[in-house]
């Protein structure tokens, strides 16, 4: 294989790489547009707070302690997002709503929560509105 063939192969790989990234970016922009349209019809509840720790993997870290502090105040509706919410029956007995990460219920609570407390990054395809506060 000569140098020209190697360069051509690399260009093809780069083109594929750029095409994949561009496709992902287009999908992300389309999803944000759809969710922004949906968010227009879902009112933000001033007393609702959505929590998530480590992309929904557990009830831990700063979000846990913030929610533990706030659960004593009945004026707030606390929602937790988990990859698997079944093991968290104790939270439900305490009046905390648990939802499955990525479910329709999760998207509803995400769009309707006044405050979003995550210890990781927001999903790139989900917009926050001007009425929402994101705490990381």
Question: Residues of each region from the PLM?
Answer:
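Active-site and donor-binding regions of nucleotide-sugar-utilizing enzymes
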Residues: 47-136
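Membrane-proximal basic amphipathic "stem/tether" segments
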Residues: 1-50, 55
């Amino acid at each position: 294989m000569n140098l020209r063939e190697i360069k051509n192969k690399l260009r093809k790989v780069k083109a594929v790489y750029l095409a994949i990234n561009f496709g992902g970016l287009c999908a992300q922009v389309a999803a944000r547009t759809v969710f922004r349209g949906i968010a227009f019809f879902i009112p933000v509840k001033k007393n609702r707070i959505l929590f998530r720790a480590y992309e929904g993997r557990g009830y831990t870290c700063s979000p846990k302690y913030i929610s533990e502090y706030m659960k004593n105040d009945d004026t707030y509706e606390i929602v937790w997002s988990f990859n698997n919410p079944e093991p968290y029956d104790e939270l439900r007995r305490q009046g905390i709503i648990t939802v499955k990460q990525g479910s329709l219920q999760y998207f509803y609570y995400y769009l309707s929560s006044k405050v979003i407390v995550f210890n990781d990054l927001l999903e790139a395809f989900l917009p926050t509105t001007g009425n929402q506060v994101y705490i990381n």
